């Protein structure tokens, strides 16, 4: 027993009534102790894993189809199939199944599950086999009634199928059909329609093989033309013999393959066009017909794939300049149908199929075809290209990068695709939408590979932006040279919307490539011209593009927007929209609201300083007033850097016990002996600390008023020379100005960061000569608020660290805002 005889594919039927390939392996039968019976075992040929372990159940109905298939149901709605490479292997396993069930191996079905009552079951089993009436014109009505009455009962269906098969009854019926048609016997033809339709519902492969044979299939189709419910018969045979004539674009040397193609086309036609739409109850009775077509297609693709001579000739003629247009049109359509057939294959089979086409040069052939003027040929080539991109985008990327080294940009495959998208003549741009989807798949980094030797993402995106992006953006740049789109018709706007949507996708998924392109080519300005379009969908596309850029919170983009005043067309579109409450209104408000909520300082300042006059009267939302408040708070912090320091002090008080990563200087500071600080030296002037806590509880608008009040109080205390407590020693005064400890206690970066707490030069703390008096004034207050003086030393240290971390970004943002 050779391996090939037992080599099988395991299939399961999914919810869509399509067969899923579960793998290839070798089948055997053996007794399985766990299952308590003889079982079918399939082990994968790749790794020996168990693909199938199925007990041969005495009550399960097994069917043998097309000599190499065994089909059965494991449970409700769970069908299995074994497809054998060789008929001999199928026969061996079939004999084993029949042996376990005690059946004759000559039958093609062992039994059917029965859902009738026990009484009906025993009546049927005890009755003799079903006897068919003589096949005569006068008995056709009786035959039709017999078929109709047998369909509800599984056992009667089985007996009817066996009788039809054993007596060669179908061929006799088809002879009567020819007689009735010659005699124009309409009543007999109607009975034959009912009989043949009923035979389809018997769901038997053996009967289908007779009906779909070369000598019978056209007569079967003829019987189904005479539907009693229609006043006139259909003309299916006329269509199949004249309109749908078979053309061998490349001669097929294998007669079996040619016959299989004919048969599959006609059976598919019967299923799709001839048979009436099955009812809910009839749908499951046609499962064998679905399986027949499916396995035929698998067989055809396999036979063509193995015929290297055929495929070599096909691609040679496709790319040959001497091939005339009609011939090339036929070749492309054949290749399209060939690829469509491959969609019935399972993933591993489809991989092998497309790998074969790739090795034969399918992408080179498509490049030639897409450069032709024939619209139909290009359309078919586009469909083939879509199959390839969906199957393996990396294969397509690798090809286009290789060809870029040899060809000009104009004839690159991707640029040809882009040009077809731009030149789509369909008013609804159906082809352009399809091609844009393919481009998106190709430039999507999510399906790009990264290996140790090369990064596909980097290489392909560099190629795309260098060789293809200018072709894609050409219609956009050509149409946005003025303040309004030069062409604003519906079809042009649809195309521009597709282009902008792809650019938006690039902004989201690409990094420096798209950033450099947008800034160097001033793409955002051009896109925002589209906000003046009369078509709202295009204006919204432009707004989405800008919103995606702002959402990145990238200062390169922000500076580009501010430098070129790119909020101007947005504000103009908002004001031109007036009081209309629509998507444009909402989209623009949401954009400004995002800037406010995310506190994008540079854009906030830019918007208020340049566009506030146009927006200040908008009061039906608080977005713009909120932006103005943000701006004023920002200016307040610039004018009073101490305000940021206050916030950091409160934050340090609240979170000072949290674990933090400290720099070396901070570690040294915390490791200093705390006794050195117990003599009254304060890390932060206590008066400042009290004042900070109090100020932050009040609105910022009252800050200056309170500051003046505090300053006046400090001056009064200084003038009055208030007495000091025991802890308020002269050394405390010196610690701020001249003692060696003062340099340790005061923030070491005070000169670099004027806004640091405790710095003598901090704005808003009074005159430059007043810090000692401030310290004297509020030392007593410090003792009342904080229990332990050494806590203050820790607080001051954390304030210093925080000011180091926060001050540089604040000063940078201030420069952007000014």
From Swiss-Prot:
- Keywords for this protein: Phosphoprotein
Regions of compositional bias (Acidic residues) in chain numbering = 670-681, 788-803
**Domain of life, per the record?**
Eukaryota
In the record, which positions carry Phosphoserine? 769-770
InterPro entries assigned: ARM-type_fold (IPR016024), EVH1_PP4R3 (IPR055236), P4R3-like_central_dom (IPR006887), PH-like_dom_sf (IPR011993), PP4R3-like (IPR051137)
Quote the biased-composition stretches of kind Low complexity, using this chain's numbering.
Answer: 729-775
The segment annotated Disordered runs over 670-818
Q: Where is the WH1 domain?
A: 1-100
What is the annotated signal peptide range for this record? none
Residue ranges spanning the membrane: these are: none
Q: Give yes or no: UniProt keyword DNA damage.
A: no
Q: One GO biological process from the UniProt record?
A: DNA damage response
Gene Ontology cellular component annotations, sorted alphabetically: nucleoplasm; protein phosphatase 4 complex
Q: Which GO terms describe its molecular function?
A: protein phosphatase activator activity
Protein's UniProt keywords contain Glycosyltransferase: no
Q: Where is the composition biased (Basic and acidic residues)?
A: 703-718
Q: How does it assemble?
A: Serine/threonine-protein phosphatase 4 (PP4) occurs in different assemblies of the catalytic and one or more regulatory subunits.
Q: Which family does it belong to?
A: Belongs to the SMEK family.
Q: Would you tell me the protein name for this molecule?
A: Serine/threonine-protein phosphatase 4 regulatory subunit 3
Q: What organism is listed for this UniProt entry?
A: Danio rerio
